[in-house]
């Protein structure tokens, strides 16, 4: 499989700026106090790619919640960049459900409440590691089709199902985020 470089701005030690996670100043948090202001992520253009897809995962979260935490799932990216705050501003992309959604396991939510939770959580949710600094993995997929047949809300597994046999190259990048300190 062909690979390509993914870029995200970090400090000299590989840490993402605080404004993109739970340690952000209040102005970068949503009205519920959650970090939904996404960083700029770019990558090398891939010859033959008609679109791209992206996932941002925290595998260190397994120590906290027993599973990897999905921070961002994005499909139908037309170019090789997601600008800063694309999660809130870029209407060309389709975003999947992050791990803050409710109702997966033994839930008191009915189906319509689950659907609402899934739609509300189809955005970037920034890092908030509670037990120390965490490593985060961005994977970008170059695809040979212009659009994936995705409909909101969709999950990471749905993205992978639709990308099957359409991935022509993959790019990866890791970064760190400092432990979340509640203010």
Q: How would you label these PLM feature ranges?
A:
Residues 1-183:
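N-terminus-centered regions that define maturation/targeting leaders and the start
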């Amino acid at each position: 499989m062909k690979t390509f470089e993914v870029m995200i701005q970090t400090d000299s030690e590989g840490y993402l700026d605080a404004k993109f996670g739970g340690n952000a100043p209040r102005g970068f948090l949503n009205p519920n106090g959650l970090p939904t202001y996404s960083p700029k992520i770019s990558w090398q253009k891939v010859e033959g790619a008609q679109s791209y897809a992206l996932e941002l995962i925290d595998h260190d979260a397994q120590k906290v919640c027993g599973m990897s935490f999905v921070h961002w799932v994005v499909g139908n990216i037309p170019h090789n960049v997601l600008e800063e705050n694309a999660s809130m501003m870029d209407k060309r992309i389709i975003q999947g459900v992050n791990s803050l959604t409710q109702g997966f396991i033994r839930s008191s939510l009915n189906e319509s409440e689950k659907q609402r939770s899934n739609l509300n959580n189809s955005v970037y949710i920034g890092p908030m590691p509670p037990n120390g600094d965490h490593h985060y993995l961005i994977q970008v997929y170059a695809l040979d089709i212009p659009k994936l047949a995705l409909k909101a809300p969709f999950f990471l597994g749905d993205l992978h199902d639709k990308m099957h046999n359409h991935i022509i190259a993959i790019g990866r990048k890791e970064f760190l985020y400092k432990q979340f300190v509640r203010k």
